[in-house]
Regions:
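PLP-dependent amino-acid enzyme catalytic core
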Residues: 1-502
């Protein structure tokens, strides 16, 4: 199977090239030229597989230039019980709210306690194999812009992996204290972390600009290096996310929560659009999904887009209690638009150019109609998020983080608006302990909060009785290794300096 750019369909590459390169030279994103089709027999066979078996099937269908042995190696190295605390790295949890069942897909049992581990534990292995196939002898320089979770997960996945170097940029005031400490204490001889003065969109724009500046790429090439990305613009990041939607469906059927062949809804807290896009791609393969429910916080650019067909990033930016969704430019939406406009690269390029130059574009009526047919967009503010965490904990003792609470709240809005009783999978993207202050304020509103986030973790543990994940429990005593801060427009110079090129 080959891949082409969303902005130049003539730019065709293999899977290994797409993963190694990360982004197309024209600035477009790589997408599969077709989708494998999973019929009833295929899905029934996957019911009998464990998570690794399901992953191997999906990877083998998309990565046709990888051998079965190579895929086995990647999957076996990534999804170990030691890293994820059990044989199933993405277990279902069943709870209730308002007397109604909630089926929660918990994606935060990995080494950094966030859903990004599901992709970033395997991406470095896919990347090193891709480099051997396409760019023998070159080292990959992985640039990451993060709103919180991606940075730590990418650092952890890439640390000390041969022939890779990783540089992570995060907004200086746009991540939680826990996330900042996780990144700045990162171990590994091939890792660099730097804060930027600005928000996530500034960081992401800076990384994209570095990727698409030929002079910088030439300097790397002269030093036997090339750029790649661990953000969800990289196909190697997006592909592993398809797996857990298929696995969730199989687990729901096996657990008696869904009849085989019946449709389910998916509810995804959404920032950069990669996670919900993976569910859409799973549906393109034949997974029976009825509705894609896109949950946003106060930065509700996606809600407005789904409801109006107009994408407009020219609006106030809010710093919220769900910082991984504090995003106004959702990069992976480009892939959806390319699919919905009939794989028309010229139209996609026109919209993306309008976004870059004026911060706004409007899709055609036909695309708008398809989006409103398949997607539901809703948002909630910090007060609603807090209330949802509180209600869920009071009713069933289930503790969730702020991003998951946004998804639950928007799902309630959806059910109220539509009356749809289709079983839904709520995607839970982070451990509540990663956002202990906001969660504590919800479940123990009258308690005096301790000064440090680590003391808040201890207090949340006492209030909830939920065990503190081991990776977070051991973080308190780690010393920070990184403290650099740079201007957004100085990012190119910082990268070259960090690599020892200038």
């Amino acid at each position: 199977m080959n891949y082409n750019s969303t902005q130049n369909a003539a730019e065709v590459v293999s899977a290994a090239q797409a993963i190694a390169q990360g982004i197309s030279k024209d600035g477009g994103l790589f997408v599969p030229q077709s989708f494998p089709q999973y019929d009833e027999a295929t899905l029934r066979a996957l019911l009998k597989e464990d998570y690794k078996g399901r992953a191997k099937k999906v990877f083998s269908d998309f990565l046709t230039d990888f051998t079965a042995e190579e895929i086995d190696e990647c999957v076996e190295q990534a999804y170990t019980a030691a890293k994820f605390g059990g044989a199933n790295p993405a277990p279902m949890a069943y709870t209730k709210l308002g007397g109604k069942a909630l089926n929660v897909l918990e994606l935060w049992h990995g080494p950094t306690c966030a859903f990004k581990d599901m992709a970033l534990q395997i991406l470095p292995h896919l990347l090193t194999k891709s480099l051997k196939k396409t760019c023998d002898g070159k080292d990959a320089v992985i640039l990451v812009a993060t709103s919180g979770d991606t940075g730590k997960a990418a650092l952890e996945g890439c640390k000390d992996v041969e022939h890779t170097k990783i540089i992570v940029f995060y907004p200086v005031d746009g991540v939680s204290p826990m996330q900042k400490h996780q990144m700045n204490t990162q171990e590994g001889k091939n890792v660099t972390v730097c804060a930027i003065k600005g928000n996530f969109d500034d960081a992401q724009t800076g990384v994209k600009k570095i990727f698409t500046t030929p002079a910088i790429s030439e300097q790397l090439a002269q030093n036997n290096m090339l750029f790649s990305s661990a953000n969800s613009i990289n196909w190697g990041r997006l592909l592993p996310q398809i797996v857990y939607y298929i696995s969730a469906y199989c687990d729901m059927v096996n657990d008696g929560k869904l009849a085989f062949g019946d449709k389910m809804n998916v509810v995804v807290p959404t920032g950069n659009f990669g996670n919900i896009l993976a569910s859409y791609y799973a549906a393109q393969m034949g997974l029976p999904i009825n509705k894609f429910i896109c949950a946003s916080n106060a930065n509700n650019v996606l809600t407005d887009f789904i409801n109006t067909g107009v994408y407009d990033k020219n609006r106030q930016f809010f710093t919220t209690t769900s910082p991984s969704m504090d995003i106004l430019v959702s990069s992976n939406l480009e892939r959806l638009l390319y699919k919905l406009c009939g794989n028309d690269d010229a139209v996609t390029r026109e919209w993306m150019t309008a976004l870059k130059t004026g911060g706004k574009y409007e899709v055609t009526d036909a695309v708008k109609e398809e989006i409103t047919d398949k997607f539901f967009g809703g948002f909630c503010d910090d007060a609603q998020t807090k209330d949802t965490i509180s209600r869920l904990f009071k009713e069933d003792g289930y503790l969730c983080d702020t991003h998951t609470a946004v998804a639950v709240n928007v799902y309630e809005q959806y059910v109220e608006a539509t009356g749809d009783t289709t079983p839904a999978v709520i995607v839970s993207t982070a451990s509540p302990y990663k956002f202990s202050k906001a969660v504590l304020q919800a479940v123990a509103p009258d308690a005096a909060l301790p000064e440090t986030e680590f003391d808040m973790v201890d207090m949340l543990n006492q209030v909830s009785g939920m065990p503190v994940p081991a990776p977070l429990a051991g973080l308190r005593d780690k010393q920070a290794r990184f403290s650099d801060v740079t201007e957004a427009d100085a990012m190119p110079q910082y990268v070259l300096s960090a690599l020892g090129i200038v």
